[in-house]
């Protein structure tokens, strides 16, 4: 797909170098031209966005200088709520639902002057690795329309890649920001658990879910993260650790930084072209002054089963609230309360969501809790300890983001296990609670984007972004 324009940076819009209304019109033009094929946006607020952009343009230079996102057009994954706007989680079960509250991360962007364009397609309830599980149709990868954009935040990644937004928000439970960023050739950031409020997020797995940004550049992603990060009294898991200026040391380079390369992430199953691109980038970082050290994260082989036990268990509890009683879809023919619950959930949930609810209910059931859920929590602790030990020796860890470039639409739809393995390099960070990012580092022979994953200590997003900026600079 050919793109007619290159969107301005956040800085260009914020400073008034590019008018807010002009930036918005560029995004809307791309949406009108490409969304019919890509299917990234589920809903748009054209009138509200236009009024907001004109308001920002009418501000004085002094007033605009107080708004770190002044006039920046952005979209949000449709698992984040906005008061009065439809919230679907890409599921039929939330048909017609308009929440009475706005997610904190979204509100912080709006308060900072950003212009909300609309809400973005995703896998249903954020469950998926390809964005083929949406009740509103799959998202297509703007880099190759026969390929998936990744999941579950495929719409958020595709919107940035197709110039439909300067930046977007997604969520990441097991790789749902980083893997789509890799597949679509954009930057995606996973904040530390607790760094960004989850208030207003329609939950999948509450101990794993994070909210984070997509952008064209590391600097733009860093600026968005700086706005949405910070303590929120509305989220009991929100951290009060101070938020630094993420742009302050972006250009410091990697000289003197210790970068760990875990052997377990370069084993069987890694596509040769991904391996070539990532290893080539690591060598460039070494040449730029980084100290590259081999490390081991020995419990990595247990990460996928551990993740799918814990995530599905939490999902089965979180999704119990969708029953047709207070909001969303209600089965019209049910004549008893039990029948209404059963029929509503059968009509409203897609196949992948049902699969995960069943698995989660099973691992929490009497007789299986100790064998599966309790054991998974013990392995989760071992995975976290692997990272704690590694970060005693290194400042950041670099790996492939995904084992392959974007695969073809429909290629893995009938093979859930193969689909789950697409997250093999990303679920560990969610289980350990650490931060990370995916930054483009090359392309395959077919021209498909490849991303490198950078993982950092708890609340050390600044170092992750610093390494990401170095990677980005090396690609130019």
Curated annotation (Swiss-Prot):
Major enzyme class: ligase
Catalytic residues identified in the record: 77, 152, 176
EC number: 6.3.5.7
Keyword terms of this UniProt record: ATP-binding, Ligase, Nucleotide-binding, Protein biosynthesis
InterPro entries in the cross-refs: Amidase (IPR000120), Amidase_CS (IPR020556), Amidase_dom (IPR023631), AS_sf (IPR036928), GatA (IPR004412)
GO biological process: translation
NCBIfam families referenced in this protein's UniProt entry, alphabetically: gatA
Quaternary structure (record): Heterotrimer of A, B and C subunits.
Protein name per UniProt: Glutamyl-tRNA(Gln) amidotransferase subunit A
